[in-house]
């Protein structure tokens, strides 16, 4: 279900306007230091209004700490996660427009934004532009360097989005990236739940996720085989 909170809707519109003014509408021209400071002040006000925390405090918190702030009874608040991810992504784009796309701060902001937006999607935030936002961040943070935890988030995101083939790809990569028996058992548990759920769906619903009933059985067998190989190695 799309967001109906008026504050969040206004925030999304404000950051869209900010991006249009300083990034997408600049035809490749870098923004000035003064424009960067002005944008940071505007973003600071938006962080405070939506999350009750300053931009500086948000920067000091790691992804897990940020997610802890967004959780209620163990569940991530989807709308707040979405707006935080959008704010971080916007700040990353603005910093990159001044310092360059390879700037460490820009990369860090974009990676944090990606993690938060994946969690928002896994919590079924329902925003129509979420896929576009995630894909844009992936272009700036290629999967080759991702930690295992991000593939776990990607798996849950794609599963929640109904993109079952993509979810399975993330699942297998997650298995390859984790280390240790306990971590691999957690992947196996997630895989069993995933395939069990898919078997309850109609063929038409599986097809919408680029999957088939035969592929459910094949995927389960392939993952079990790879799991055994990793344990034996």
Write out the residue ranges for each language-model feature:
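Generic helix N-cap/helix-start motif at coil->alpha-helix transitions
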Residues: 11, 144-151, 186
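Short, structured interface segments
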Residues: 128-142
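Charge-dense, low-complexity intrinsically disordered regions
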Residues: 152-155, 159
């Amino acid at each position: 279900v799309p967001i109906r909170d008026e504050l969040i809707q206004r925030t999304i519109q404000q950051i869209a306007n900010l991006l249009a003014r300083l990034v997408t509408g600049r035809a490749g021209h870098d923004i000035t230091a003064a424009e960067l400071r002005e944008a940071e002040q505007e973003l600071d006000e938006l962080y405070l209004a939506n999350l009750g925390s300053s931009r500086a405090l948000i920067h000091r918190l790691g992804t897990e700490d940020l997610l802890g702030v967004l959780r209620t009874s163990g569940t991530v608040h989807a709308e707040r996660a979405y707006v935080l991810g959008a704010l971080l992504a916007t700040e990353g784009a603005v910093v990159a427009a001044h310092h360059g796309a390879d700037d460490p701060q820009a990369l860090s902001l974009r990676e944090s934004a990606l993690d938060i937006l994946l969690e928002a999607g896994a919590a079924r935030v329902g925003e129509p532009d979420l896929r576009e936002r995630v894909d844009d961040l992936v272009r700036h943070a290629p999967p080759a360097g991702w930690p295992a935890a991000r593939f776990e988030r990607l798996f849950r995101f794609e599963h929640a989005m109904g993109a079952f083939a993509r979810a399975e790809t993330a699942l297998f990569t997650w298995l390859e990236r984790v280390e240790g028996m306990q971590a691999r058992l957690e992947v196996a548990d997630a895989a069993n739940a995933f395939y069990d759920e898919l078997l309850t769906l109609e063929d038409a619903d599986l097809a919408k996720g680029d999957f088939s009933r035969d592929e459910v059985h094949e995927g389960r067998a392939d993952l079990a085989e790879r799991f055994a190989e990793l344990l034996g190695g």
